[in-house]
């Protein structure tokens, strides 16, 4: 029985047919610019095509050097570059898939000094100021887009996606906030949208009639001075007339201060926006953002919100997502949790994309899964992220794996993380591992403390025993009002109304989010999420912003977060999500103070020095989030007994809780042992 009839229905485009309603959305992987990038991209995309993706869209490639994402970024403007691309397109076609090249001119977001834009207005997220394009330069850029599309066809691509949203060049022409021209390319909306329309028209003319053209259209800019819904409809109709095959609806500029793809955003939070465009155009519409589950995708399409869904990061998490769904194995899907830690955050520091829950993503050629030649009996101590990743991957290769944990359930630190408001997706990772333990035949032993003697009979021992909270040397640290984050998050210790949190790392922020949450998290309610973040669901306001702005509720507790370092609190949080946590906590009234020296804790509260001045924080509880210590008690006795011992996860490096590193370490060891 097909549980997802709408999702797996074919889509007739006239000159070609897509086998289902799933578009793999564009993601920059960091491989586009690497010497071995073509071969690695080919393996990455081919694996997704093999498992049923109807149409893949590549990471953004600039039509001209002025539009690269960063200095040295990918460009397609010359026939000499075609062999690189043919490696990718041939690999996808061998697996029965279709692939489109995203043509992306980043405009004023280009992180290099020779950037261009409609007007010389610097982006708030870029240190470079763009050059304002002349009339002749605009015409040349239109030709660059058309040439890029023609080259894409020659390289074997089935189509292109013209990136017209997210605040990039085409979007900058459309919005009054970034287009302050008074010539034929600016002024009223008819002139501001001319560049977008001329680009699509030129692409269609050069690429031919039987070539897919997707236009990525911004439905909600989520910035002041952004577009209106009437303008969006006008543009969509003009883009269709100019030759677009599909319209893919985008949400939010990169400089917008409203979360659109991170874990706290509800699933399919913006499909209602796409639905508003249904009936206004006749080409298929694609909706996107936080669609990470086949049932969510099925519901979006079956209720008529869109004709297709775009899923990008979910295919990092699981290349087999669609084949598992279609074959009745949806419970085996490794679900994207929207954390961004191994994908977007990696890209922003110049590294290759991967995935927290699937470290093989974009590293398929370097991390092949092959049957074990020498099958071993392996003991894994600790069923946290590192231990789980090792156990299921090693067992899938044919090793006999026994997984021990002293607690009554698997998960380790993930069982704590999933309780943080907005991190409910972490339940999915634990569901996945529970199922894969069954599928791969891992022998799971819960509520079992093990000694070195219990492990002597195994060929090798993998210690993934995790961490213990570090106790800082502060006078009065054993006072009854002192709690660790485990006391609060795991053991549900009662916490008073006035709280000091020592430590502003990830655990400190998680604890503050947990204690400051008033009622249910809006991550499970689209309407409440939109109100909380000031999104205008009536689409009556420019930019899609409510006039009253965000309505983030206040914390029921008085919370102050403290750290020894003088740097900005939360500096080590992810680039794409850290600002969300900071903004949320500050809006709730949580205070953050760096540069603190801790003197003592007593009945009166926490005594500190701030800026060299003594202060007394009269709090009910002091919560310790001041780092971790590795738990490796078994390592030495096992080695003394002659056993081969591997340390992974927090028991190897415990400076900060890092699920990305833990799962990657466990997976790599499992694939090599």
Regions found by a protein language model. Give the residues of each.
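Flavin-dependent oxidoreductase catalytic cores
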Residues: 1-381, 385, 390-396, 400-401, ...
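Small-residue-rich anion-binding loops in enzyme active sites
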Residues: 320-336, 448-468
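Helix-enriched interaction subdomains in cytosolic or periplasmic regions
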Residues: 337-351, 458-473
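Rossmann-like dinucleotide/flavin-binding elements
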Residues: 376-403, 445-453, 457, 465-474, ...
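N-terminal Rossmann-like dinucleotide/flavin-binding domain of flavoprotein oxidoreductases
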Residues: 412-458, 570-596
């Amino acid at each position: 029985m097909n549980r997802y009839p709408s999702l797996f229905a074919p889509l007739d485009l006239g000159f070609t047919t897509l086998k289902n309603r799933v578009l793999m959305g564009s993601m920059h992987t960091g491989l586009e610019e690497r010497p071995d990038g073509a071969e690695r991209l080919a393996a990455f995309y081919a694996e997704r095509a093999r498992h049923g993706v109807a149409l893949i869209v590549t990471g953004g490639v600039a039509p001209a050097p002025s539009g690269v994402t960063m200095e040295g970024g990918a460009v397609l403007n010359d026939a000499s570059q075609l062999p690189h691309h043919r490696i990718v397109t041939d690999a996808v076609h061998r697996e029965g898939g279709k692939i489109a090249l995203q043509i992306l001119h980043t405009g004023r977001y280009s992180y290099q000094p020779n950037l261009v834009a409609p007007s010389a207005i610097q982006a708030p997220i870029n240190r470079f100021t763009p050059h304002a394009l002349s009339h002749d330069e605009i015409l040349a850029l239109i030709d660059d887009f058309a040439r890029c599309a023609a080259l894409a066809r020659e390289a074997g691509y089935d189509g292109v996606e013209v990136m017209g949203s997210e605040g990039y060049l085409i979007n900058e022409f459309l919005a009054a906030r970034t287009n302050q021209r008074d010539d034929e390319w600016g002024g009223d909306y008819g002139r501001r949208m001319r560049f977008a329309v001329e680009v699509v028209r030129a692409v269609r003319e050069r690429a031919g009639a039987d070539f897919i053209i997707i236009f990525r259209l911004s439905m909600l800019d989520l910035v002041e001075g952004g577009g209106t819904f009437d303008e969006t409809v006008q543009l969509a109709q003009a883009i269709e007339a100019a030759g677009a095959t599909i319209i893919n609806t985008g949400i939010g500029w990169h400089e917008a201060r409203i979360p659109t793809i991170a874990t706290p955003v509800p699933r399919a939070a913006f499909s209602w926006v796409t639905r508003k465009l249904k009936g206004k155009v006749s080409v298929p519409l694609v909706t996107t953002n936080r669609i990470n589950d086949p049932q969510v995708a099925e519901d979006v399409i079956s209720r008529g919100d869109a004709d297709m869904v775009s899923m990008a990061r979910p295919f990092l998490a699981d290349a087999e997502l669609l084949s598992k769904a279609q074959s009745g194995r949806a419970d085996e899907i490794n679900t994207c949790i929207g954390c961004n830690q191994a994908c977007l955050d990696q890209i922003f520091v110049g590294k290759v994309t991967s995935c927290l829950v699937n470290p093989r993503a974009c590293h398929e050629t370097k991390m092949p899964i092959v049957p074990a030649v020498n099958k071993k009996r392996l003991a894994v101590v600790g069923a946290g992220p590192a231990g789980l990743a090792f156990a299921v991957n090693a067992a899938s290769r044919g090793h006999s794996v026994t997984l021990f944990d002293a607690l009554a359930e698997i998960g380790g630190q993930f069982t704590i993380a999933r309780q943080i408001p907005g991190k409910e997706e972490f339940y999915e990772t634990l569901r996945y591992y529970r199922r894969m333990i069954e599928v791969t035949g891992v022998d799971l032993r819960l509520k079992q403390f093990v000694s070195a003697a219990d492990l002597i009979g195994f060929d090798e021992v993998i210690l993934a025993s995790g961490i213990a909270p570090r106790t800082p040397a502060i006078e009065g640290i054993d006072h009854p009002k002192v709690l660790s984050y485990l006391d609060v998050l795991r053991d549900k210790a009662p916490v008073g109304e006035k709280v000091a949190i020592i430590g502003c790392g990830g655990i400190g922020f998680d604890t503050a989010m947990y204690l400051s949450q008033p009622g249910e998290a809006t991550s499970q309610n689209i309407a409440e999420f939109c109100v909380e973040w000031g999104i205008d669901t009536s689409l009556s306001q420019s930019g899609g912003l409510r006039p009253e702005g965000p309505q983030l509720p206040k914390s029921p507790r008085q919370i102050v977060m403290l750290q020894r370092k003088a740097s900005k609190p939360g500096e080590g949080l992810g680039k794409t999500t850290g600002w969300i946590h900071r903004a949320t906590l500050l809006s709730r009234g949580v205070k953050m103070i760096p540069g603190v020296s801790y003197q003592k804790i007593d009945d009166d509260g926490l005594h500190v020095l701030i800026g060299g001045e003594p202060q007394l924080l009269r709090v009910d509880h002091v919560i310790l989030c001041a780092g971790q210590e590795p738990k490796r008690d078994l390592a030495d006795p096992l080695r003394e007994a002659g056993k081969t011992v591997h340390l992974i996860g927090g028991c190897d490096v415990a400076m900060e809780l890092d699920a990305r590193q833990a799962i990657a370490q466990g997976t790599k060891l499992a694939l090599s042992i």
